[in-house]
Amino acid sequence: MTFFAYGPHSTLSGSGVTVPAVGSITNAPKLTFTIESTNDAAKMTDFVVAKNDASATQDRTHANSASGVTFTFRHVLSRLTFEAKPSVELSTTTGAKGTTYVMVRTAKILQSSSPKFYKSGVLDCADESWSGKVTATGDYDITKVLALTDEKAIVNTPADHTSNKYDAVKLTSNTTPITLFTSNEYLFLIPETAKTGTGTTSAGDVTIRFDYDIVTVDTALGKGYAITHHTTDAKLPAGALKQGVAYKYTIEFGINEVKILTPAVENWGSEAPGNITV
């Protein structure tokens, strides 16, 4: 007998997993997965599936039934996180003049330049393959996963901030990147290919637009600093979005452009068996 399992169980605002109607499944189920649809990347969830080893012999007598059915869950999405640094070492001179910062303010996946950014797809639990992928129809705001802090102590003129705050990720060192995302926050995206495939074929199949400021402290100026605003698009390199792969990208922010460097592949945890009582 074959059992299938998946997680997460619940859905949120039409997001997550949709299971076929009871009685309509004759073979392995096909599950529809939709990414978080309220445009809140902080609510994105991982998606894992498993099936038991039907060829394995298990003692199903009453005395041993509490042991449950053994499953090995596997990640079927792609996981992305980002760290960032300035493209050059910025001046960190202390005092009245000279300190410069890159302030990352907002970010979004740019739908018009992201043909491989999917809002939904269908996973076949028989072989964990994807089909029926639907391209997103709008930009996807990921600002809520940025590790923003209030930098009003630096940018303190009302015209340069909103709601009496200046929220940004502050970058200073070219040698030491810092994480752009809040701890334990990730993007979970529908993959382009299996783990053994090639991933996306072209740079920019997924493109992220960043709004950022370059701020230089200068007490000789009326407001104590000079600020320039920038909006630039960063293209994920080819080879992204393999199923079950966790990527860590380093982004370089410059005066006129943003570059995403070759990613590192992170450990996404072991695919260790676990028991579920059925």
What are these regions (language model features)?
Residues 1-114, 144-166, 170-173, 177-180, ...:
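Short, low-hydrophobicity acidic/polar segments
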Residues 1-2, 9, 180-205:
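Short Pro-Gly-centered beta-turn/loop motif in secreted/extracellular proteins
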Residues 131, 139-145:
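Conserved small-residue
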Residues 109-113, 132-133, 137:
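Predominantly extracellular/luminal regions of secreted and cell-surface proteins
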Residues 71, 142, 186-188:
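Generic recognition of long tandem-repeat/solenoid scaffolds
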Residues 110-128:
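Short aromatic-acidic-glycine turn motif
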Residues 88, 176, 194, 198-271, ...:
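Exposed, polar/acidic Ser/Thr-rich sequence context and nearby capping/turn residues
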